[in-house]
A protein has these predicted regions:
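Short, low-complexity disordered leader/linker segments with a strong preference
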Residues: 1-42, 354-358
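Early extracytoplasmic/lumenal segment of secretory-pathway proteins
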Residues: 36-104
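Extracytoplasmic ligand-binding site segments that recognize negatively charged/polar headgroups
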Residues: 46-54, 77, 91-233
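A ligand-binding cleft/hinge motif common to bilobed small-molecule-binding domains
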Residues: 101-105, 233, 237-256
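A bilobed periplasmic-binding-protein/Venus flytrap-type ligand-binding module shared by bacterial periplasmic
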Residues: 147-152, 197-198, 269-281, 292, ...
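Periplasmic-binding protein-like
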Residues: 173-181, 210-214, 222, 253-277, 292-315
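Conserved C-terminal helix/tail region of periplasmic/extracytoplasmic solute-binding proteins
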Residues: 328-358
Length: 358
């Protein structure tokens, strides 16, 4: 099954990181200017939503009509597992819009080529790798949110005002009415589980005790970060543990939902870009990475996510204040180091409620 392969490959990645396994990117740095091209064909792996990929590439093709982009789109966990499996013979030229926590695993395996696209100085320091020449560059951030269907809650004798925190999800009235993402296949699922464990004390049992209780109320774990929001919007569940943009977009379409950002703070991750370490770098890959952090691209990302990795200004529709204030203090290094154990333990405890693979 995909999720078992994903967990196994991520486990291997964590082991390689801890043992210092080298790869084809070790000691190599791409020319800062790159050998850009205005024509060619590249393969891009991404975990961006399908509709986002379509919109973003339409804009890219306006500027570079002679570059053909072959897209492989999967959820974060599947893309990460695929990149790990192909590490010694990478098929992708570029990774685009995939979780920074996954990039850190790949970076520790020397699977990423250090490269600094034009305009990288605009990217805030906390949103790109800390190496002198970055191995990955963030583009936007997404965060845990609860998407609650007010009509379904009313049937349970509840209102949206009663759900403000992680603890509120343990209400016995919600038993069988919550849908959440599987962290093995979904970046949203992993960032949420990681946040709970960090908020409850990282290496203590308190976080797992909470997840045990939450599991009692969960009807199903799905393999997409946005699917819980869509299921809440359609009335298939009362609460979808998803991410902000997914819920707000459903509300904008007229669904009877409210989007709740937990008062303890939201788990979060970055969508980031990277150049794959290969013996020969496709010049069009440099071109794509330059465009992917350009002002044009950032304007597109901002339409979907309130937090982009250049300086954020303006109003944030659907948020009470600056969304940066909603984010927990995320220990990415801890999350990457413990990813194998977290995923294995989660699978052992909760996988029985995961949806069947499509």
């Amino acid at each position: 099954m995909k999720k078992k392969l994903c967990a196994a490959l991520l486990a291997a990645a964590a082991l390689a990181a801890l043992t210092g396994c080298g790869g084809s990117g070790e000691g190599n740095t791409a020319d800062a200017e790159g050998d850009k091209a205005d024509a060619g064909e590249i393969t891009v792996y991404t975990a961006l939503e399908d509709e986002q990929v379509t919109d973003y590439l339409a804009k890219f093709n306006e500027t570079y009509p002679d570059i053909k982009v072959n897209v492989v789109r999967e959820s974060t966990g599947i893309i990460t597992a695929k990149l790990i499996a192909e590490k010694d013979n990478p098929q992708a030229d570029v990774v685009w819009g995939t979780a920074a926590s996954s990039m850190m695993v790949l970076d520790d395996m020397d699977a990423l080529q250090p490269y600094e696209p034009e305009g990288c100085d605009r990217i805030l320091a906390q949103f790109k790798s800390d190496k002198e020449v970055p191995t990955w560059v963030g583009i936007d951030a997404w965060e845990t949110a609860f998407v609650v269907n007010t009509a379904e809650l009313e049937k349970l004798g509840m209102t949206a005002d009663e759900i403000t925190s992680y603890e509120d999800l343990l209400d016995p009235r919600l038993k069988g009415h919550i849908v959440m993402s599987n962290p093995n296949s979904s970046g949203t699922g992993f960032l949420t589980v990681s946040a709970v464990l960090q908020l409850k004390g990282k290496d203590t049992e308190e976080g797992w005790n909470y997840l045990d209780q939450l599991h009692e109320n969960v009807a199903q774990y799905v393999h997409s970060g946005s699917k819980p929001a869509k299921m809440a919007a359609s009335g298939e569940c009362a609460v979808g543990i998803s991410f902000g943009y997914a819920g707000l977009s459903q509300k904008e379409k007229g669904a009877p939902v409210e989007v709740v950002f937990p008062e303890e703070g939201s788990g979060w991750d970055l969508e980031a870009n990277a150049l794959m370490a290969k013996d020969e770098i496709n010049p069009a890959a440099y071109t794509f990475l330059h465009w992917a952090i350009s002002d044009d691209a950032m304007d597109l990302y901002r339409e979907n996510y309130p937090i982009v990795t250049v300086e954020n200004t303006g109003e944030y529709e659907g948020y009470e204040g600056n969304p940066l204030d909603q984010l927990i203090e995320n220990d990415f290094s801890w999350a990457a180091k413990n990813r194998e154990d977290i995923l294995n333990q989660w699978m052992e405890k909760y996988d029985g409620k995961s949806e069947a693979e499509s």
